[in-house]
Amino acid sequence: MAPKDSQVSASNEMTGNPPSSVQGRSRNGCITCRIRRVKCDEERPHCRRCQSTGRKCDGYTPLTGQQPKQQPPQQAAKAGSSELRIIQHTPQVTQPTQLCMFPGVDTLLTEDEYRALEFFNVQTVSCFGPRAGGWLLNAACQDSAIRRAAMALGTMHRVVLYHSRTPPHDRRRGMQLALQQYNSAIRQGLKLFAGSNDSSADGILSMCVLFFCLDSLQGHFRSALRHVGSGLRILAQRQLRGQRAENTLLPPDVIQSLFAALEAQMLEIDGQSPLLDENGLPVRGAGRPAPLWTLEEAQDTFRSIYNDFLRLLSFSARLEEPVDELEMVQIVEQVMARKQQVQTDLDAWSLEFDHFLAHIFHWGNQASQQSVRMLQLWRTMLTMVLHMGWPPQDTAWGSHLSELNIILDLAEQIIVMSPPLELESSAGSTFSLQGHSRAGSPSGSRSRSMSTSSSASRDDSPTTTTTTTTTPTPRLKKETDPQSTYTPILPRPFHSSPSRFTLALGILPALWTIATQCRDSSVRYRAIDLIGRSKRREGVWDSDLHFRLALQLARHEEQAAGLDAGAEYTHARIPPEARVTLNGRFDEGRKAKISYIRENVRVGEEIFHW
């Protein structure tokens, strides 16, 4: 029996109707577009379509082995019924290829899905640190729900990182794609709640981390913090059961490290955490790590001490509550005991850290040097605050200007050491700082970001963290949209690529504290300047938003003190009755309600949008 295509061709010839001519999408396009059978824009010497998708344009040299010239329709009609035409469809991807970058993924992916997962690997995993990022990528390759969440985060991160270089219609399409993947991940994640094994719990915890990052990138900070609370409550239940997790997607110490960073976000912003018991004291972890052998261990150990410090600040607020004398004595004893414990832990860590820097650490990698500067910055900050008297008073900051300048010097070094963010053009800040000196600060408002991931990672990280220098051929289900364009993805350099988003210990909380607590104009405005120039988002800490808030607070205090704009002043020029405290809360969406309080009286209120 003749093939169906043969019957159609023969029937056409018998009736005298000319057969339809099979043509490619591009006759005069470049070789690459002709092979892919997509429309070429015929830009020379290299077409923009190939460049926008990260492909190499092979130029316009004719393909070898030209197809025979087709007969005119009149000659084809006279050819007779004995002529047989075989019409064969050639798919865009001739043969599915194995995903070299993601060998654990055994399902077919669309181009959008592959590009999202590729971007997650090349750019996004560095935001979690080398070890945690590797384990999250490994979990995404093994679990479909986590993989879908990783795709959504990769797509959203790509939209944010390339925002200024992407046309508006492509940005809208990227946002829509990220939200579609986000909703799909939520639907798949709901199925994990039905499971009772440790793998299901790990999947939920991993998705809480990824969803937090995705909502933070969108600017939905209240929703992001809710994901943190959900994950911390799951961890608290695990701790109460006292069961050791087995067959997990992520090692327990990796989960602990990730949620220590997320808990710090809740404590810094809201002063609350689900891991606080009824007395407001922390539910302590399983113990401190061993003596420091890697920079990442130093970061994890310090993070534990830093979170205890934040819990201490939160609980110390009870000292201002009206209670009877006996209860107040008990609260004071608890606070001072907790403060002494934090001080002891910090002193012990400092000795270990100094020994690590002197005898183990090698100063070779710029990203590692940034991480060391970050730890030195926060050690100085915590040591200074713990020696102010407890709880710290507004008047105490004026006597620690030397330590504050050391902290600002370290923050400046971190920003200057960061590679320039070439992926995005510099954008000026919303407000200007005219009239205020920026002692020790480089001029201009360079847009920079920083990466604090350690170069020294443990050997038990999953092998999927290794990045090849070339992009593997994706195993595609179909090409979703011939008109869609993709910004080229470059191989990750030896140290992590600059990223506008990170979960690592950052500079913004320290700079914000100095900008709002210190009333020396040179120190205050240098801190505000560094916030604006950092161009960075550390979880829910957004440099642009907090730059606006810090500048607004400073101007409120200066106006109340009768100071002209741009005037230099010391602590004494801002009396207590002119000082302002911010009481803010993130609302749903991209806004926050900010109240300005002076001497326990609300003097103003404002809604901030971003």
From Swiss-Prot:
PROSITE patterns (UniProt xref): ZN2_CY6_FUNGAL_1 (PS00463), ZN2_CY6_FUNGAL_2 (PS50048)
One Gene Ontology cellular component: nucleus
Compartments it resides in: Nucleus
Region annotation Disordered: where it falls in the sequence: 1-27, 61-81, 427-493
Cross-referenced InterPro entries: Transcr_Regulatory_Proteins, Zn2-C6_fun-type_DNA-bd_sf, Zn2Cys6_DnaBD
Compositional bias per record (Low complexity), positions renumbered to this chain: 66-79, 437-474
Biological process (GO), any one: regulation of transcription by RNA polymerase II
Major localisation: nucleus
Any one Pfam family match given in the protein's UniProt record, by short name: Zn_clus
Record keyword tRNA processing present: no
Record-annotated DNA-binding residue ranges: 30-57
Source species, domain of life: Eukaryota
Keywords of the record: DNA-binding, Metal-binding, Nucleus, Transcription, Transcription regulation, Zinc
Feature: compositional bias, Polar residues: 1-26
GO molecular function: DNA binding; DNA-binding transcription factor activity, RNA polymerase II-specific; zinc ion binding
Annotated SMART domains: GAL4
Function noted in UniProt: Transcription factor that positively regulates the cluster that mediate the production of aspercryptins, linear lipopeptides built from six amino acids including 2 highly unusual and nonproteogenic amino acids, 2-amino-octanoic acid (2aoa) and 2-amino-dodecanol (2adol).
Annotated protein name in UniProt: Aspercryptin biosynthesis cluster-specific transcription regulator atnN
Protein's organism: Emericella nidulans (strain FGSC A4 / ATCC 38163 / CBS 112.46 / NRRL 194 / M139)
Lineage: Eukaryota, Fungi, Dikarya, Ascomycota, Pezizomycotina
GN (gene name): atnN
